[in-house]
Amino acid sequence: MRPDEEDGTTKSPGSRWTRIWAIIALILLILFLLVLGAAIYFYINYKDSSDVCLSPGCIKTASVILSSMNSSVDPCDDFYEFACGQWIKGHPIPDDAPSVSNFENLGQDLEFALKELLDENDEPYDYETSAVGKAKYFYNLCLNESEILDNWRTTFDEVVKSFGGWPSLGHQMKPDASIEMLYADMVAKFKADSLFKATVQPDDKNSQRHVLLIDQPQLNLFARDFYVAAENEERMAYLQLIRDVLILLDADRTRATLDAKEIIDFETALANITMADEHRHDIAELYTKITLGEMRRSLPHFNWPLFFNRMFKDLHEKNGKRITFDDNTEVVVYGYEFLRRLDVLIPQYDNRLIVNYLEWCWFFKTMLRDLPDPFALTIFKFYKTLNIMNVQKVRWHGCVTRINSLMPMATSAIYVKNHFDHEAKQQVEEMISLIMESFVDLLLSEDWLTKETKQTAKQKVNEMKRKIGYPDYLNDPAAVNNEYKTFKVYPGHYYQTKFSFYEQYQRDVLERITEAVDRERWVAGAALVNAFYSPNTNEIIFPAGILQPVFYSKDFPSSMNFGGIGVVIGHEITHGFDDRGRLYDNLGNIRQWWDNATISKFEHKAQCIEKQYSSYVLDQINMQINGKSTKGENIADNGGLKQAYRAYKKYEKRHSRPPRLPGVNLTHDQLFFLNYAQIWCGTMNDKEAIRKLRTSEHSPGPIRVKGPLSNSYDFAKAYNCEPGSQMNPREKCRVW
């Protein structure tokens, strides 16, 4: 017997094949595990490479985001610094401005685009019939300093003569000089608003018709505070400016010094009888409708019938009948107490002083700011003292601003033709629908609103008219030409042309007194970086100029567009339900459509916002925010952010998820809030910061980020902020 037979382990041919198959199976298993490991490694490291957008637009967007952020900062500690830290370091304040911001940069980009369009002169200007031709000709007249220096005094002397002379310049006043007639002429021809504002606008209690309106004056310094506070640098610089300008106009030096002091004393007295803006939020309380007859009897020291009839003396109804007013004519007054105090103030000053004040204001607002040297140097010294600028702005900036203000639809026509992304209109339409839908959902879920109030509020949202980009007629040159057919150009004469434009612009406004309100009319041009809610027409307006980065871009993922223009849309919708907008119904009429219990609950919620913002300090100047004067805008910021985010989540469910941005390690929820914050990246010098806190109804940029985000549970969740952290306080405020 063989040894292998003796131990009982003899092997057959089948067992050998079993071993071979086992080896093969082991090899296959090893190969499978290697492939699986490689697949897992690839999945972990490269799974999203197809989900990254590498288009030039996405790369640029990612670059802008990353270059603005300070990622070393904890977003739950200081989100403004996290979002804007590097932007601020990379954007020093320019010498010709007191501040710089993303928002201001957009405005400058738009200005430059208009400049290039107005500079184009491929063919001779048709300033007889073409609106664009008139705008271009006006712009070039404005740039021609030598021609202005040759002609300005002639126009100045003619206007002053029509006023009856300027006493500060040694002109003899007529014994029967009438303040009412002088100021009426200034309002009718130059849009004057220095004694009080007088205009025509829709009646807030009957929004289908126009009405005569009186309101407080627009003072020449930045705010009422600069007059009523103790002696300050702003007022001293303003006094010096008045004196220096009077001397440049050939006034006697001694007389100029005395008159400058009297002018500023009168303006200060005028400021003291006005109401601070923070107390003017309740439009219903301010609104007083009174007849001219009642004004004549109760305010005897100003002849109101004479004033209004003089103001409209050259205006006619469509049937050719002259527009006149009698004792039965109704006037809406915003702040009747101001008029009562004005009636007491006027007799305390002689006519000579009041005429000097009115003519100074006329010159300051209509001529001084676009006269070349030596006047330009004088007003520059004033601005430099106030730290508004350290070098003079290049002249074209002011020229673009003036023509865009006087002929907004002409400049808008060329702007949208060359710079508007027409796809944006359709996309923004969808965003508005979603945001309105989200706001209605929010309204219906609020337990502090009664059922009746919810239904009326829902109706107001659903009937809110939307205007996006520009009015369609801007595509029709003939229609634009027709709008400005009465605007007359005087070749070679800048101020004569400017004043004729002023008068025609104002004529168009005043003639509406006999017409029904046209709800299709745009209240602003399209070449504008801004957005609006109009309460007496219940409409939201988004001009073409704001539909650009950082607010909107077709290269942005949807998260960023909702965090940008989406929040702006939500902000404007919320204005219809803030402390002012809530007073108007769906038709744009002031009436009480909330019951008293609901009003009380609203005011309690709004008070929380006011108290919260009043506790904030702008660290740069260690000065508290005025939570009362900024309350309406703060309510809109908070509500707009919440609505836009909810709308974005709706959008996300209905559309495919956008690809990621290259190199940006943030979720789309995080990008939503980041883009909102980066809109407000900016910096300003200390004096500008003080002016903004005293004059603006908006909180400064850092607070517009901190306030709404610290009230947002959605933000805290997106950035995993612990309760009690700086950006996720346990106590939060919200109205909507």
From Swiss-Prot:
- InterPro entries from the entry? MetalloPept_cat_dom_sf (IPR024079), Peptidase_M13 (IPR000718), Peptidase_M13_C (IPR018497), Peptidase_M13_dom_2 (IPR042089), Peptidase_M13_N (IPR008753)
Does the keyword Lyase feature in the UniProt annotation?
A: no
**Topology feature Extracellular, residues:** 41-736
What GO cellular component term, any one, is given?
A: cell surface
Q: What class of enzyme is it?
A: hydrolase
Coiled-coil residues are 103-123
Tell me where in or outside the cell this protein is found: Membrane
Gene inactivation phenotype reads:
Severe defect in olfactory plasticity in response to the odorants benzaldehyde, isoamylalcohol, diacetyl and pyrazine.
Q: Describe how the cofactor binds.
A: Binds 1 zinc ion per subunit.
Which Cys pairs are S-S linked?
A: 53-58, 76-721, 84-681, 142-399, 608-733
Which domain of life, per UniProt? Answer: Eukaryota
Q: Where does Zn(2+) bind?
A: 571, 575, 633
Task: Identify its membrane topology class.
Answer: Single-pass type II membrane protein
Instruction: Write out the GO biological process terms.
Output: olfactory learning; protein processing; regulation of chemotaxis
Question: Is Transmembrane one of the keywords?
Answer: yes
Gene3D superfamilies noted in UniProt? Collagenase (Catalytic Domain), Neutral endopeptidase , domain2
Q: Which residues lie on this side of the membrane: Cytoplasmic?
A: 1-19
Which tissues is it found in, per the record? Expressed in muscle cells, GLR cells, SMB motor neurons and AIM interneurons.
The prosthetic group or cofactor this protein requires is:
Zn(2+)
For this UniProt record, the keywords arranged alphabetically read as follows:
Coiled coil, Disulfide bond, Hydrolase, Membrane, Metal-binding, Metalloprotease, Protease, Signal-anchor, Transmembrane, Transmembrane helix, Zinc
Q: What are the protein's GO molecular function terms?
A: metalloendopeptidase activity; metallopeptidase activity; zinc ion binding
Record domain Peptidase M13: where: 52-736
Protein family according to the UniProt entry = Belongs to the peptidase M13 family.
Q: What does this protein do?
A: Required for olfactory plasticity, which is the change from positive chemotaxis to dispersal after prolonged exposure to an odorant. Thought to antagonise snet-1 by degrading excess snet-1 peptides and thus enabling olfactory plasticity.
Q: Which PANTHER family match?
A: NEPRILYSIN-2 (PTHR11733:SF230), ZINC METALLOPROTEASE FAMILY M13 NEPRILYSIN-RELATED (PTHR11733)
For this entry, the protein name equals: Neprilysin-2
Species this protein is from? Caenorhabditis elegans
